[in-house]
Amino acid sequence: MIFIVVKFTIRPDKADEWPSLVDEFTQATRGEEGNIFFEWSRSVDTPNQFVLVEAFADSAAGGVHVSSDHFKNFIAWVPGVIVTKPEIINVEVPGDGWGQMAELTPASAS
């Protein structure tokens, strides 16, 4: 599995719009055959920073993704709304998706 984490720092005036700005790209990517997950989170410390956590089945699926029209479109417009070059971690890891955290179990409801 190809596991990728990308930090985007968005112009403060565009931060609240970010989820709607990336929605079409997000939905298209989630629809790709080799996509395992594609999830956005907003930083609780830096309100104009968003973190994308994504995974693809293998490097071939990742290649299909970066060759897609929706990826190319995203790359074309994003420079207008970011304030720093995105930071990325891109690694190949064993597995095919999320696992359960062994150290935690929800408390039973009383």
Stretches with model-predicted labels:
Residues I2-W40:
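N-terminal first-folded block
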Residues I2-T9, E39-V66, E92:
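Short, well-ordered beta-strand segments in beta-rich or mixed alpha/beta enzyme
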Residues E24-F37, A55-N90:
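An amphipathic, aromatic/His-enriched active-site/gating alpha helix that lines ligand/cofactor pockets
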